[in-house]
């Protein structure tokens, strides 16, 4: 058996760290396979009260075993593939606070960061990003002919770009970015921030730019599902926002992690297996679509969910 008692490290050690008192009882007479930890509220006040139980179910680490059992039926492979946002490690080069009129617009997209998604600023992007590749690993030398202004701009910042520290840029075409593909440019995305202490899902649509309507690109602090169909996108957003889905996420997530929401966690959610009230979900989806200004087909939604 195991127990964990959180300790207020600031109070007792004047340290800005997480701390705990962890006990483990090893007894060969106890039945095997009990991989659970009783997590108490505090080492001193309320020490006798168990706040929740951590444990391993199959191969999954669960942060609240009791809550997990109520929605365990939804723990299965996601019917959709979750994607990460764009990574470039050079914000001063690739990102802009106003539309860069001096660069070819084909490579300029509205940009949302995780904080924008979390704060509900997803309908009005205020940043722009230069995406020099439309597919991962795509050659970039053609830009000197197809987008000479973009090429000259990148050459002007070559020192910063060529010296990015991450290994992912090594042995790649010059000025490469990472975490992009056809899904990056999907017209609709159901997104959330991976960095915040609450899971908030937003329906991201295309945005108007000085050069016409463009897909919105999400940065690498976000996770998202790409969609072409607005009814499907609104319905999935409604399911992810449902109390049942939020309870499932709460049962798995460890909010004190640097990135509490992960692709691995999201990929555990079998959206269509959640015990939701389906008429309520469809009504919520219709409202989400109306707020986003996109089409919603009630009959199509009923067929899907």
Positions of PLM-derived features:
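Polyanion-binding catalytic cores of nucleic-acid enzymes and NTP/SAM-utilizing transferases
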Residues: 64-215
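Short, well-ordered beta-strand micro-motif
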Residues: 21-25, 113, 224-226, 270-273
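Non-catalytic DNA-recognition/assembly elements of restriction-modification systems
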Residues: 47-58, 65, 267-305
């Amino acid at each position: 058996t195991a127990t964990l008692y959180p300790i207020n490290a600031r109070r007792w050690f004047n340290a800005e760290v997480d701390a705990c008192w962890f006990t483990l009882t090893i007894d060969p007479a106890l039945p095997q396979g009990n991989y659970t930890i009783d997590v108490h509220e505090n080492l001193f006040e309320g020490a006798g009260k168990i706040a929740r139980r951590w444990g391993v179910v199959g191969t999954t680490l669960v942060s609240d075993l009791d809550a997990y059992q109520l929605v365990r039926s939804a723990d299965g492979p996601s019917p959709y593939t979750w994607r990460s946002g764009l990574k470039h490690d050079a914000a001063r080069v690739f990102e802009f606070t106003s539309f860069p009129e001096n660069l070819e617009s084909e490579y300029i997209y509205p940009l949302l960061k995780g904080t924008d998604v979390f704060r509900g600023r997803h309908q009005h992007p205020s940043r722009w990003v230069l995406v020099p590749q439309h597919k991962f690993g795509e050659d970039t030398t053609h830009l000197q002919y197809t987008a000479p202004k973009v090429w000259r701009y990148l050459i002007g910042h070559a020192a910063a770009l060529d010296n990015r520290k991450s290994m992912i840029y090594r042995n790649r075409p010059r000025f490469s970015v990472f975490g992009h593909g056809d899904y990056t440019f999907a017209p609709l995305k159901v997104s959330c921030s991976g960095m915040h202490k609450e899971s908030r899902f937003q329906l991201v649509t295309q945005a108007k730019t000085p050069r016409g309507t463009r897909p919105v690109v999400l940065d690498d602090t976000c996770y998202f599902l790409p969609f072409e169909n607005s009814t499907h996108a609104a319905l999935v957003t409604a399911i992810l926002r449902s109390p049942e889905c939020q309870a499932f996420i709460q049962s798995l997530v460890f909010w004190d992690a640097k990135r509490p929401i992960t692709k691995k966690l999201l990929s555990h959610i079998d959206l269509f297996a959640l015990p939701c009230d389906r008429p309520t979900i469809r009504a919520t989806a219709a409202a989400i679509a109306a707020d986003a200004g996109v089409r919603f087909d009630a009959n199509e939604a009923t067929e899907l969910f």
